Curated annotation (Swiss-Prot):
Protein name: Glycine--tRNA ligase beta subunit
Class of the enzyme per the UniProt entry, highest EC level: ligase
An example Gene Ontology biological process: glycyl-tRNA aminoacylation
NCBIfam families: glyS
GO terms assigned for molecular function: ATP binding; glycine-tRNA ligase activity
Chief place where the protein resides: cytoplasm
PROSITE patterns recorded: AA_TRNA_LIGASE_II_GLYAB
Gene name of the encoded protein: glyS
Subunit structure as annotated in this protein's UniProt entry: Tetramer of two alpha and two beta subunits.
Catalytic activity as recorded in UniProt: tRNA(Gly) + glycine + ATP = glycyl-tRNA(Gly) + AMP + diphosphate
Gene Ontology cellular component annotations, sorted alphabetically: cytosol
Keyword terms, alphabetized: Aminoacyl-tRNA synthetase, ATP-binding, Cytoplasm, Ligase, Nucleotide-binding, Protein biosynthesis
């Protein structure tokens, strides 16, 4: 037999961005509790609004199933006394398990006998277990939480009501003075209380009180109303999933309405208008079918269609004030030159241990010029780098960016164009913030890519130099994101920049600037290890096997595009028939070559058989061809060596008692091993 179960946590309005994750957490905790208590059920449905987190468990068993449990007790030598009777330890074990001594048996485990009991446990009634769900509710965690009243519980918002029902029965428990009942609350202004007769009635009972408890239904209702408005007005209202998710979690009964603003505000940069509407007011911007921004907006009301004109006028008034402020800020910004703005950067501290923004920009300039040298850029291009790095943070002191920080870079591009900077420089000012997320868009220009890489790597190394490094989940300065972003840009451009060497040079530059608190070699080692770990993430995103990741990073990880290519090619051929014997042969070379010592050069006159000469000839050919071979051709060249390597080992005693012969043979293998290791640390690859 089974019944439905309903649990609703009624709260003061939660921050919209935490509603979805909170109800998902509640679902998981309830599911885990049910499984731990061996209570079967068919499915769990979730409902959520800004004022409630709810789970409805369908077809929950009315009692646990009877089950057989086993328990292990003391060893036999402890369980029996000298006369073969049960000892106090054995009798105590029997009492603790609520069985008679006669029920005790022995079982051998790894040569030692232990007491065991097997007992049937009668399943408990579900109603007897459900009150402990109180701990599930109180154990929830949130990104933000608060105290209220005189209780000790920290929660996302104060709990105002609770429902816990199994079928028609109320499950009794209390949290912070709030007792469970079968009564919920409707819409704050339009609804009344709702008495739930049984769990399955919950959605409809709340709908009668102007609450759409199903978040997906609220979202779909908003989308349908947006599409209807588009069709009616011949507008285009672009779907923004983040904004749609947020407004869905801001309302309980959604009604879409439109408003207007003065056409003269369209003279502001489009990004300023859109940001004002979306980020500050949670409005949807309106476009024409030709993608032109129109002097209208769409918002979602938490209520019905009554007095929509009044609501629209109120929203228009708020937006008008916002746009008036933005227009003032924009006009003030146009009065100052870029150089005047740059001068103010020397008064802004980037970090107390790393100086001002002006000082950071000078360091980034040096890094960008290092990158330009690696890429053989011409002097004219380097002059663009110098101009760019002299100004690229200037918009941080503008009024618009002060009011709308999310527009940094975007406004820099616009102001730079207005003041006659080269388009390439203006675009790079915007692009240096990219990517803004792990999967975000990358810079599309070479200049933007250079400055983005330089800015990110200088930030990374700078913080390592003053011993500020990510620990566990803590990364307050986004250093993991900086490293990952820089590597994505390098890979996307296919630039064979020696990254580890570059990091070492940046550390030396930081020391020259007086920013290094730790020994330079220690910093170099730490930051290079950190970058290698980020490289692992890059390769994991390409679905590379973990052992192959270890192999290529253990080889030469210096140039990122080549590293990714090597990993992908190894991953592609790992199931090929020739792959295993090739890896085994190369691994044998690498392992024995580790015994090579000193600077012994190969002397062909010491060869004693044709197999030594054959391997030597193949290595000489590899030396000559290697630099011009593609990554896949290098792997083919190694595979072609397998027979020669096998013949060599079958017919040559490397560790000869003759020291001169031994050293000569180790030197030959060491030469080959150096090429293998540059490609990958083959002994890391699992071919068993």
């Amino acid at each position: 037999m089974s019944k439905d179960f309903l649990l609703e946590i009624g709260l003061e309005e939660m921050p919209a961005q935490y509603v979805t994750s909170s109800v998902a957490q509640l679902e998981k905790r309830v599911s885990d509790w049910l499984n731990e208590n061996q209570i079967t059920f068919e499915k769990i449905k979730t409902y959520s609004t800004p004022r409630r987190l709810t789970v409805l468990v369908e077809a929950m068993a009315e009692e646990q199933a009877n089950r057989v449990e086993e328990a292990k007790g003391p060893a036999k030598k402890i369980a029996l006394d000298d006369e073969g009777n049960w000892s106090k330890a054995a009798l105590g074990f029997a009492r603790s398990q609520k069985v008679e001594p006669a029920d005790l048996t022995f079982r051998e485990i790894k040569g030692v006998e232990y007491i065991y009991i097997k007992k049937e446990v009668i399943g408990e009634k579900t109603t007897a277990l459900l009150p402990s769900l109180e701990k599930v509710v109180t154990s929830m965690t949130f990104p933000v939480s608060m105290h209220w009243g005189s209780n000790d519980l920290r929660y996302i918002r104060p709990i105002k009501w609770l429902i816990a029902m199994f079928g028609e029965e109320i499950i009794p428990f209390e949290i912070t003075g709030v007792s469970t009942s079968n009564t919920s609350r409707g819409h704050r202004f339009l609804g009344k209380t709702a008495t739930i007769k049984q769990p399955s009635d919950y959605p409809n009972a709340l709908l009668e009180q102007f609450v759409v408890v199903n978040a997906e239904e609220r979202k779909q209702a908003i989308v349908e109303q947006l599409r209807e408005l588009e069709s009616m007005e011949n507008w285009q209202i672009k779907e923004d999933e983040d904004l749609l998710e947020e407004v869905t979690n801001l309302v309980e009964y959604p009604t879409v309405l439109a408003g207007n603003f003065e056409k003269e505000y369209l003279e502001l940069p489009e990004e300023v208008l859109i940001t004002t509407m979306k980020e500050h007011q949670r409005y949807f911007p309106v476009f024409s079918k030709d993608e032109e921004l129109l002097p209208h907006f769409v918002t979602v009301r938490n209520g019905n269609h009554e007095n929509l004109d009044t609501v629209a006028r109120g929203n228009e008034k708020v937006l008008r004030a916002r746009l008036s402020d933005a227009d003032f800020f924009y006009q003030e910004d146009l009065k100052i030159t870029i150089d005047e703005a740059v001068a103010k950067l020397q008064n802004i501290v980037f970090h107390e241990k790393l100086g001002t923004l002006t000082e950071k920009m000078k360091r980034v300039q040096k890094v960008a010029l290092m990158l330009a040298d690696y890429l053989d850029w011409q002097e004219e291009d380097k002059q663009d780098i110098i101009r760019l790095t002299n100004i690229y943070k200037f918009d941080l002191v503008t009024n618009i960016v002060g009011e709308f920080p999310e527009l940094q870079g975007l406004m820099g591009e616009k102001y730079a164009l207005l003041q006659g900077e080269k388009p390439a420089i203006a675009i790079a000012i915007r692009e240096h913030y990219l990517p803004s997320s792990a999967e975000g868009a990358l810079p599309q220009t070479d200049l933007g890519s250079i400055i983005a890489i330089a800015d990110k790597l200088e930030t990374l190394v700078g913080f390592f130099c003053v011993n500020i490094v990510p620990t566990g989940s803590a990364d307050p300065f986004g250093l993991r994101r900086s490293a990952f972003g820089a590597m994505r840009i390098i890979q996307a451009n296919g630039w064979d920049i020696p990254v580890l060497e570059l990091l070492s040079r940046i550390v030396d530059m930081e020391r020259a600037e007086g920013a290094v608190e730790l020994p330079s070699d220690d910093v170099k080692k730490e930051v290079q290890t950190f970058l290698k770990n980020r490289l692992r993430v890059v390769l994991q995103n390409h679905h590379i096997r973990h052992d192959i990741i270890d192999a290529v990073i253990g080889g030469d990880p210096n140039t990122i595009p080549q590293l990714v290519d090597r990993a992908q090619i190894l991953n592609k051929h790992v199931e090929s028939d020739w792959f295993r014997p090739t890896v085994e042969a190369l691994t044998r070379v690498m392992n024995i070559s580790k015994k090579h010592e000193g600077n012994v050069e190969v002397d062909p006159s010491l060869f004693e058989n044709k197999y030594e000469q054959a391997l030597f000839d193949e290595i000489e050919k590899l030396k000559y061809d290697y630099a011009n071979l593609t990554i896949v051709d290098r792997l083919r060249a190694f595979a072609a060596l397998r027979t020669t390597i096998d013949d060599y080992f079958d017919n040559t005693l490397v560790m000869s008692e003759n020291i001169e012969l031994k050293n000569n043979r180790l030197a030959l293998l060491f030469e080959l091993a150096s090429f293998i290791k540059e490609f990958a640390q083959m002994d890391e690859i699992n071919v068993k």
